[in-house]
């Protein structure tokens, strides 16, 4: 070989192998933008480098971009300068040939000359391999991948070393040839390994094709970090994050790209996609779209293909939003000015169709007929145009012959939209045909999308505008009033809406429509959630505020809140005043205020609103023509009936039926009329009018579902309930009907039959995950747990669905198969320990929370806490990117679950700490505030209880638990009146609220109003006669009987509760029984004299009572020793005549009575010590001890034992004949307990000893009345004092009452009654 040639090749190799960072970056940029169709941007990159450096390969690439832009003369002039370049001539020649061939009138002579020159240069051995490499590069962009590969192979053979550019171009050519093997990836990795940026771009492309979003993000992130100023790296990272649906990360990438707004069109496309699909901020969206348009005008002003592509993207993700479609039209106008390509005209028709512009659709349709265009919108343009002016028969005639001429139409979703409209307006108006066409539309769209990873190309095909057209077509079949279950129409629309929302959660109107769907199936909680999601994206959405007002009224919320929502909606759209819906909701607010006349006036105003002209456009839903008029008529009828204007109501119904006769709305009216009959209790009438709807009529489906509900809920007829669904299945044997019949059998608790129908539906619709979930639930309901587990496992593997995994884990948890449950939950967590996309993070959080529950069940608390901490950490990752109300609530929920675990384990300090974390997420969170209140209450920290409790009541004034805690707070603080009011409020809502009832009995009996306490006890029994068997009621009734002196009845009540599983009521009952055992019928067996001079009988009686009390005390021992238990234990021990035992018990009480600083901490223990001294006849220390309580503030906690202390002091003074001092203490007792029978007894004794029998009789009369005149002992004392005061007839009457209670009470007859009669005879 010639030495000169060899030397040249060595120089070439040096040049090729030299790592020129700036050249590589520039070439990689140009390659990237050219592949992506941003030819103008690529030219700007070329010009930027060529202005400072002579770079022939880059100059040739500029020529390629000029050809792609259609600037042929300029491209030819530019490329001719390099056709003789020694190193790159082949590339320039191929580019020149391409340019000439692309001209409007190709110069054949020039093309022949160029081909000859190419052939000559290619055969020349002196041609350097760089020239072949350049040729391969040009041919790649020309789409001639096979020729490109041949040239690159020659370049490789002539080069002794292969470098990054070679590997990378070979990889791209392989991709162009459809090769996506591992070898292609290795080529890109080799190029990337030499720090050639386009090599890493190739890696990203391969991973994108494999749908490997996480790996793509890692690769793009490496590129973005290693070459910070290489913009395609940031773009690819953003695309990876879009694939992961991490929209917050996308915006971070846009910011990190550090590009001036509007300077780079690709960045602006990403910003616009983020704005429409996620941000949803309408006010910002206008500016975003304007920035994108400006960027294209500045960088790609003659790139009509890019204008058209972006137009299609915007239309596809618009959700048929009018504002977005009008912006899209601005982009397309620029493309059409540059080129009138048929596809662009078809796209223009699609926009006009979306805007409902029938005239423009007609004009464009005529143009498309003359053009050769295979776009479905073009093929069906004339049919579309006809349907937009109601020419149904002409449209059908054309439509029927279309598939024969264009077979591929059957794969187009748009074809099925047209078919659904024609089915809806056919003679039979078959809903089933309509529904099937919509299902086909969804299926075809999914088929088109399934091979594409989620990204720009996916969004280009998504067609949310088309889906929304299909959704609107379903509106005509919607119910007018909320139903109890979704029908097929709403299931269908919910499916499509969810598809749109999953792709573009920024489309607020989609969230609003999902809210409306939930509202119409009476799922108010879900409806509220969707309304907030809609307003989160667009708070100016007037319809969302109106629906919120509707929801507030239907849920019985505050009327003012509903009014506020109405006003807010009106502020955003004043035209709402012209709609029936606005007046309908306004009338409901008047009805809630019982302003029926104003409601009637508002409804009549609504009916006088001028009827909107019905559109001829069959693609426009009738809802836009204000079908709420029917709802107004029904509401008017209902209001007239409520106000007893029956004739007016019937006339209005007749007018409505006449107005809508023969129209589809008539059937809607029939359904609503049936609902109206039902609210009036006319079940048969409701069934009769529903039965009139026959197969083929639009509301047949809904009528049978409604009939089934009536048979089940009103008539309790399961047979007819199933028959309605069987009739549906007979008429419409579709997967939906089989599924509905399965639902019906699930509703009547017959899961085995349900499984058969679900399985049949799944055979017909094998990809339906929801059906699979229903089968699993049916297996569980049928207690076929092994089958359920196997089914969930197989379904989890088939559908790759997170819900299946969660359901399986939940079931395993219920079955106590903790090991397998943990394994199922661990698998996805271990597979991706640090997820980055929002959806995966949210799924992981659900897995972790369930795993924490699993760990708690096996007592692995440290692991459970780790699960909670990991869940919180993952949640914080999402919240760092966005800070929505929903996310804050979710963060609070996670904290609450952890706090509740601490609370269950009585670990209060960490529970308080986690509750405070929850409040940092969401400061008005109810659960955390309630839990804090509960913890402070359990810790007896009442000063801290009030703040979290009031925080709850500010948000939810009717919260029962908060009101109860507040009532207890007042009770503990001895604010009896406030406490009473709060408890009564709770009882008015729920007469069976035992805690509140117990407190009310206590408070009323202390006030001396025991008859009122009895009324509440009777109210509970009236509300539920079976409540007498409940422990709560038994303890409340026992307490009442104890206060009224009937200890035998009290004991019977308490005995019913002593074995209750409810620990609270069981303990109360047992302590009360022990107290009665030690002091039966308030008769003192033990006193100082009986201990001093113990008789055998007294000792035996005391021992028997002590033994009985001990039995019940032992039952309490199972709960565990508490302070109250130790007190009861010592009182039982003290109930003896043995002085040593009494002294030992005093020592025990001493240990409990005082704190380290000798301050009193237990009034009960002080009473125990004093009673012990009193029994041992040590009156002086007893008195000194009791006097130490002087000045102690009375409170409900100490009330019982404070009263006992005062009574004991009074008894000591009565024994010492110190009447005045005794009276002081007895008055103190009666001040806080007007029904204290022991106080009455001691007071009576004192007055008798003073021989003040009149006063004594008054006291005994109070005591006798307090016991409902059932106490023989008080009856005897009253009769005795009446005898002494010579009130003889009243005395005899009292004696008779006692004998009526207990005929075996001869003492009263012999000692009092006979004497009184004798005294009457002698006077």
Curated annotation (Swiss-Prot):
Belongs to the TTC21 family. The keyword Cell inner membrane does not apply. Gene3D superfamilies: Tetratricopeptide repeat domain. GO terms for cellular component: cilium; intraciliary transport particle A. This is Tetratricopeptide repeat protein 21 homolog. Pfam families: ARM_TT21 (PF25058), ARM_TT21_2nd (PF25060), ARM_TT21_4th (PF25068), ARM_TT21_5th (PF25064), ARM_TT21_C (PF25063), ARM_TT21_N (PF25062), TPR_7 (PF13176). The keyword Nucleotide-binding does not apply. InterPro entries: ARM_TT21_2nd, ARM_TT21_4th, ARM_TT21_5th, ARM_TT21_C, ARM_TT21_N, TPR-like_helical_dom_sf, TPR_rpt, TTC21A/TTC21B. It comes from the Eukaryota. Keywords: Repeat, TPR repeat. GO terms for biological process: intraciliary retrograde transport; protein localization to cilium. TPR repeats lie at residues 56-89, 411-444, 580-613, 667-700, 702-735, 736-768, 770-802, 804-835, 845-878, 892-925, 927-959, 961-993, 995-1027, 1031-1064, 1203-1236, 1238-1270, 1272-1305. Disulfide bonds: none annotated.
């Amino acid at each position: 070989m010639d030495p000169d040639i060899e030397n040249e090749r060595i120089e070439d190799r040096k040049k090729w192998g030299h790592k020129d960072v700036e050249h590589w970056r520039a070439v990689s940029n140009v390659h990237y933008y050219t592949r992506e169709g941003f030819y103008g941007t690529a030219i700007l990159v070329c010009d930027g480098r060529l202005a400072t450096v002579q770079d022939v390969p880059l100059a040739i690439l500029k020529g390629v971009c000029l050809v792609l832009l259609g600037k042929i003369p300029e491209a030819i002039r530019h490329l001719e300068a390099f056709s003789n370049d020694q190193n790159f001539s082949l590339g320039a020649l191929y580019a020149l040939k391409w340019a000439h061939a692309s001209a409007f009138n190709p110069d054949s002579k020039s093309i022949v000359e160029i081909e000859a020159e190419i052939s000559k240069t290619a055969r020349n051995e002196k041609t350097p391999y760089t020239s072949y490499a350049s040729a391969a590069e040009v041919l790649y962009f020309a789409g001639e991948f096979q020729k490109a590969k041949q040239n690159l192979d020659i370049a490789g053979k002539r080069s002794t070393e292969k470098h990054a550019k070679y590997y990378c171009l070979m990889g791209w050519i392989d991709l162009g040839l459809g090769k996506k093997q591992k070898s292609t990836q290795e080529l890109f990795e080799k190029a990337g390994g030499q720090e050639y940026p386009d090599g890493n771009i190739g890696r990203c492309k391969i991973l994108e094709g494999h749908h490997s979003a996480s790996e793509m993000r890692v690769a793009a992130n490496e590129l973005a970090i290693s070459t910070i100023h290489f913009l395609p790296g940031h773009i690819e990272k953003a695309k990876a994050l879009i694939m992961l649906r991490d929209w917050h990360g996308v915006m971070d990438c846009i910011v990190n790209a550090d590009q001036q707004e509007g300077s780079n069109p690709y960045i602006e496309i990403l910003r616009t996609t983020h704005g429409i699909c996620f941000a949803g901020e309408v006010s910002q969206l206008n500016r975003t779209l304007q920035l994108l348009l400006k960027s294209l005008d500045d960088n790609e002003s003659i790139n009509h293909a890019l204008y058209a592509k972006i137009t299609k993207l915007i239309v596809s993700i618009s959700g048929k939003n009018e504002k977005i479609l009008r912006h899209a039209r601005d982009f397309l106008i620029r493309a059409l000015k540059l080129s009138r390509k048929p596809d662009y005209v078809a796209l223009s028709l699609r926009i006009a169709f979306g805007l409902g512009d029938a005239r423009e659709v007609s004009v464009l349709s005529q143009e498309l007929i003359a053009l050769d265009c295979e776009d479905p919108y073009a093929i069906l343009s004339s049919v579309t145009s006809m349907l937009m002016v109601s020419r149904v028969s002409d449209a059908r005639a054309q439509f029927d012959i279309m598939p024969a001429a264009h077979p591929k139409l059957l794969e187009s979703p748009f074809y099925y939209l047209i078919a659904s409209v024609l089915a809806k307006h056919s003679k039979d108006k078959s809903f089933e045909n309509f529904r099937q066409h919509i299902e086909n539309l969804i299926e075809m769209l999914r088929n088109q999308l399934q091979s594409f990873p989620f990204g720009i190309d996916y969004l280009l095909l998504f067609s949310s505008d088309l889906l929304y057209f299909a959704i609107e077509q379903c509106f005509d079949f919607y119910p007018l009033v909320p139903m109890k279950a979704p029908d097929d129409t709403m299931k269908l629309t919910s499916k499509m809406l969810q598809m749109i929302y999953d792709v573009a959660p920024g489309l607020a109107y989609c969230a609003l429509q999902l809210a409306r769907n939930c509202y119409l199936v009476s799922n108010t909680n879900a409806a509220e959630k969707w309304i907030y999601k809609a307003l989160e994206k667009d708070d100016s959405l007037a319809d969302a505020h109106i629906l919120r007002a509707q929801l507030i009224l239907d849920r019985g919320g505050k009327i003012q809140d509903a009014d506020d929502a109405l006003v807010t909606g009106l502020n955003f759209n004043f035209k709402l005043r012209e709609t029936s819906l606005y007046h309908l909701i306004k009338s409901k607010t008047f009805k809630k205020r019982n302003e029926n006349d104003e409601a009637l006036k508002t409804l009549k105003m609504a009916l006088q609103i001028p009827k909107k002209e019905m559109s001829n456009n069959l693609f426009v839903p009738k809802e836009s023509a204000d079908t709420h008029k029917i709802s107004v008529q029904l509401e008017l009828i209902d209001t007239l009936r409520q106000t007893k204007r029956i004739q007016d109501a019937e006339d209005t119904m007749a007018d409505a039926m006449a107005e809508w006769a023969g129209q589809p709305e008539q059937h809607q009216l029939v359904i609503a009329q049936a609902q109206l009959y039902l609210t009036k209790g006319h079940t048969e009438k409701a069934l009769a009018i529903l039965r009139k709807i026959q197969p083929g009529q639009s509301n047949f489906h809904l009528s049978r579902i409604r009939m089934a509900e009536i048979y089940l809920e009103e008539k309790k007829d399961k047979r007819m309930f199933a028959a309605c669904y069987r009739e549906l299945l007979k008429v419409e044997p579709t997967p939906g009907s089989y599924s509905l019949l399965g639902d019906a059998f699930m509703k009547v608790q017959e899961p085995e039959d349900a499984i058969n129908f679900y399985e049949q539906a799944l055979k017909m619709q094998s990809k339906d995950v929801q059906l699979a979930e229903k089968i699993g639930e049916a297996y569980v309901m049928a207690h076929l747990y092994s089958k359920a587990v196997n089914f969930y496992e197989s379904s989890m593997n088939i559908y790759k669905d997170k819900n299946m995994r969660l359901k399986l884990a939940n079931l395993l948890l219920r079955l106590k198969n903790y090991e397998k449950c943990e394994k199922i939950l661990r698998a996805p967590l271990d597979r991706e320990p640090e997820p980055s996309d929002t959806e995966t993070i949210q799924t992981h959080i659900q897995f972790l929370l369930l795993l924490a529950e699993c760990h708690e069940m096996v007592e692995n608390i440290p692991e459970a806490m780790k699960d909670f901490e990991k869940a919180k950490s993952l949640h914080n990752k999402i919240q760092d990117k966005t800070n929505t109300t929903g996310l804050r609530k979710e963060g609070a929920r996670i904290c609450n679950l952890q706090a509740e675990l601490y609370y269950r384990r009585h670990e209060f300090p960490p529970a308080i700490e986690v509750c405070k974390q929850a409040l940092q997420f969401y400061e008005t969170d109810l659960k955390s505030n309630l839990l804090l209140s509960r913890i402070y209450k359990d810790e007896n920290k009442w000063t801290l209880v009030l703040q979290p409790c009031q925080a709850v009541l500010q948000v939810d004034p009717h919260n029962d638990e908060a009101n109860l805690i507040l009532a207890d707070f007042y009770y503990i603080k001895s604010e009896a009146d406030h406490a009473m009011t709060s408890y009564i409020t709770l009882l008015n809502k729920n007469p069976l609220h035992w805690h509140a009832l117990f407190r009310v009995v206590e408070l009323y009996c202390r006030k001396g109003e025991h008859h009122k306490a009895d009324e509440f006890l009777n109210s509970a029994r009236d509300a539920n006669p079976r409540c007498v068997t409940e422990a709560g009621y038994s303890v409340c009734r026992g307490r009442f009987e104890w206060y009224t002196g009937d200890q035998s009845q009290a004991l019977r009540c308490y005995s019913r509760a002593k074995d209750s599983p409810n620990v609270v009521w069981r303990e109360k009952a047992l302590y009360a029984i022990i107290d009665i055992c030690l002091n039966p019928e308030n008769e003192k067996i033990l006193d100082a004299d009986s201990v001093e001079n113990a008789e055998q009988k007294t000792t035996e009686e005391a021992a028997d009572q002590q033994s009985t009390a001990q039995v019940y005390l032992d039952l309490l021992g199972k709960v565990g020793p508490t302070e109250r238990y130790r007190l009861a234990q010592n009182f039982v021990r003290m109930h003896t005549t043995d002085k040593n035992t009494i002294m030992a018990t005093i020592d025990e009480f001493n240990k409990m009575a005082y704190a380290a600083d000798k301050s009193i901490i237990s009034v009960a223990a002080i009473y125990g010590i004093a009673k012990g001294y009193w029994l041992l006849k040590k009156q002086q220390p007893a008195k000194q001890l009791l006097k130490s309580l002087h000045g102690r503030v009375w409170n409900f906690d100490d009330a019982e034992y404070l009263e006992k202390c005062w009574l004991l002091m009074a008894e000591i003074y009565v024994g010492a004949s110190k009447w005045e001092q005794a009276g002081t203490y007895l008055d103190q007792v009666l001040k806080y307990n007007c029904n204290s029978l022991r106080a009455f007894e001691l007071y009576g004794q004192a007055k008798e000893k003073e021989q003040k029998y009149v006063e004594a009789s008054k006291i005994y009369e109070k005591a006798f009345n307090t016991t409902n005149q059932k106490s023989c002992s008080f009856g005897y004392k009253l009769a005795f004092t009446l005898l002494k005061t010579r009130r003889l007839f009243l005395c005899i009457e009292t004696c008779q009452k006692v004998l009526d209670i207990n005929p075996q009470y001869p003492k009263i007859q012999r000692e009092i009654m006979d004497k009184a009669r004798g005294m009457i005879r002698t006077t």
